Amino acid sequence: MKNFISILSIFIIVSCSSGKTPVEEGLESQILHWGNGSEPQGIDPHIVTGVPEHHILIGVCEGLTITDPKGGRENLPGVAESWTLKEDQKTYVFNFNPNARWSNGDRVTPEDFVWSWQRALTPTLGSQYSEMLFYVKNAKKFYDGEINDFSEVGVKAISDYELEVELENQTPFFVGLLAHYSTWPVHKETVLKFGEMDDRSMKWTRPGNHVCNG
């Protein structure tokens, strides 16, 4: 008898439930349900370091290049729809996708990357992946305080749609590094609206504040 009552109770509970899957509920409410495994520490690409954060960032942000989602080794276009390597084999010119946009509608520009890389290389921000950019000419010198003028670092917006990056040495794998979230851009106006360039509070990433480009 007890078993019958237990089974009946389960049947009633199941019958009273909506029966909708998370996917169905998401489609109905237009809310993305993401099974991330664990709580992220944040979503500032220049501060976070973990896998849970990475899983979220690749869904909402984009760098100059992206990794092949099918597992291929080729670097695929991201914000940069194409790029060229000059004869010195150290200088890249990235050509931006004119349709690349921030979530607030602003166009993603080469200057966004210049400012973002300066932020990532600012020691007081404490980015644990700043060395990813040390392949760029004078980037380590700026990080170490040997130079203070960021214009001496080898990253420049040479037009509204072109970013030039000069490296210290020939680095064939550099384009692949640009798919790592620590090299991705952040929205300057939004970051500065909620703090300084090197503010680690991540207020700019909170709900209602966050602007992304993915």
Per-segment meaning from a language model:
Residues 82-129, 164:
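Aromatic- and charge-enriched surface segment that lines or borders ligand/interaction sites
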Residues 65, 69, 88, 101, ...:
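Sec-exported extracytoplasmic/periplasmic mature domains
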Residues 2-9:
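Sec-dependent signal peptide recognition
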Residues 23-33:
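Immediate post-signal peptide segment of exported/extracytoplasmic ligand-binding proteins
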Residues 14-15:
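C-terminal motif of bacterial Sec signal peptides marking the signal peptidase cleavage site
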Residues 69-70, 167-214:
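Gly/Pro-rich hinge or "lid" segments in bacterial periplasmic/extracellular proteins
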